[in-house]
């Protein structure tokens, strides 16, 4: 997979980028495994490695390029279980990037006009099922069309937050605000 280039985005302290390839998967799983060993949770280590491998396959299937997440301790900061994935998106021939996003979601897409151009945003919440019952996932999508007339191409970022059904709603909203703030730093180069 080639590197995505032509943009920059600022992540908070303690966040890392992982490419969605074999090297990135190994690096991520090693990080998760190391953390679980530090916590003395070998059973959880095995479950999380299996879950991470399954999730990595899904990311590969959707042609996700990279994920960003908080994976390092930073004194004075509390990290929420938020991750952000990025992938290239090309609309079907004869369509624009914005119109092509309809193939990704049934949620309402809202357009925000900004100094760098329109930002397309949509969100949805999915309740947990089966083994994940009681754990919801709230996701927010952000679309950035290439800054060219009637562009069919652009980038899609998806921020995802997993949380228990009884989580403090203020913390959930704070995580979504953090994702919105991160996306506000996006710039084409």
Would you name each region that the model predicts?
Residues 1-95, 125-127:
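Secretory pathway targeting signatures of secreted, lumenal, and periplasmic proteins
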Residues 83-189:
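Short, well-structured beta-strand
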């Amino acid at each position: 997979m080639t590197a995505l280039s032509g943009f920059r985005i600022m992540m908070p302290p303690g966040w890392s980028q992982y490419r969605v390839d074999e090297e990135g998967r190994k690096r991520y799983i090693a990080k998760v495994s190391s953390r679980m060993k530090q916590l003395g949770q070998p059973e959880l280590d095995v479950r999380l490695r299996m879950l991470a491998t399954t999730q990595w396959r899904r990311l590969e299937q959707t042609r996700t390029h990279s994920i960003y997440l908080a994976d390092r301790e930073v004194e004075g900061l509390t990290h929420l279980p938020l991750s952000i994935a990025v992938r290239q998106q090309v609309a079907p021939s004869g369509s624009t990037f914005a119109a092509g996003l309809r193939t990704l979601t049934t949620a309402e897409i809202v357009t925000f006009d900004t100094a760098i151009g329109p930002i397309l945003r949509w969100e949805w919440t999915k309740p947990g099922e089966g083994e994940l019952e009681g754990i919801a996932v709230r996701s927010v999508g952000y679309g950035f069309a290439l800054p060219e007339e009637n562009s069919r191409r652009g980038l899609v970022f998806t921020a995802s937050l997993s949380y228990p059904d009884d989580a403090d709603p203020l913390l959930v909203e704070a995580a979504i605000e953090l994702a919105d703030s991160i996306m506000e730093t996006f710039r084409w180069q």
